[in-house]
């Protein structure tokens, strides 16, 4: 009987004080929720990416003392903005020519960047809590779409280039959980393009991606330490080696 009366109180406190209970997070993580079902049916490539990111981020957050269930939930929804233009994202291009072939670098960058804005709009339409929308806002921080920016620079050598045209709107991560999601998202996505899967390649990939994010000051507003980041790197490397069935070769 007490449990029955407790549920309305939980929702009341969440509305009044802006926090989310584990009960609410577990509900949002349910793969049968309308938005996650739409994600899995319409863009299965992005859905699988989100699942892998959720697994990476959850384990890392648990290890460094963050809210593992919160980051898992945020990870499941972070890319919902891709629903509007699924074919422009590599994980959804199965054996087909990329539609970016018909666009210039600025147009391509605009579409890629817009998945963050679209994601926020969709999240609000489905009444997702602000704490989950924060993961959508921050998962690219203020980084650039490096591939299209690099192509643009090659095409416009000697010209003054406005890099802001290729930059995500931010904000940068402002908590352990949002910082971990940014790392997990970039590492998981980049791991799919490795030409060779071995311990050296995975080590180099994880270090390069996260060190670049550090160099771009993406984590200066989050309460994450270098010790935390080293722990996160170790977990990502171990997880990726398991995912890609990499065997560790021991010296004879």
Where are these regions (language model features)?
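C-terminal domain-closing interface element
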Residues: 1, 5, 9, 125-126, ...
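Detector for methionine-enriched segments
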Residues: 1, 20, 76, 182-183, ...
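Generic detector of multi-pass transmembrane helix bundles and their immediately adjacent loops
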Residues: 1-40, 44
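Short, mixed-charge, low-aromatic patches
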Residues: 6-16, 31, 72-79, 161-166, ...
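In a subset of proteins, long, contiguous C-terminal domains/tails are tracked
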Residues: 13, 17, 42, 190-252
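Short coil/turn segments at secondary-structure boundaries
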Residues: 25-29, 50, 87-89, 148-152, ...
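Divalent metal-dependent catalytic cores for phosphoryl transfer on phosphate-bearing substrates
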Residues: 36-49, 54-199, 203, 212, ...
